[in-house]
Amino acid sequence: QIYADVKTWCICKGFVDYICPQLYYSLDNPALTFEDSLTAWSELDINKSVKLYVGLAGYKANSDADEGTWLYSNNILADEYKTAVNNEKVSGIMLYSYSALKDENASTEIANLTKAMSNNLDTENQTTVPIQ
């Protein structure tokens, strides 16, 4: 059996460089909202050398996942991005999966996320990679 003690990893210097919880919930997920999950992760006691990145679910964009809550808006990923980067404990985001960047069904959602990231670009601390 595999056991992952994330709290220990976060507290002890040198165990990990960063953690990236997969917050693959929509803002309105009936089981657990994105914001509630983000709050729980950001309240962990994290060593200053460990960065917290947030994993976003690009593959769920414009899908019927999470009881259809991804169908209500084309700004879910953009709103989650804004929520994440406004949290002082969050160092950035990671998007899963690469295929979402080219998915026709997710194109509006991905474009809105890209726009939100461009509008928030701090050239000293963030990097955006152009989608080709």
Enumerate the predicted regions with their spans.
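Substrate-binding cleft of secreted/luminal carbohydrate-active enzymes
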Residues: K7-P30, L44-I131
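Charged helix-capping and loop-helix junction motifs
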Residues: Q1-A4, F34-T39, N75-I76
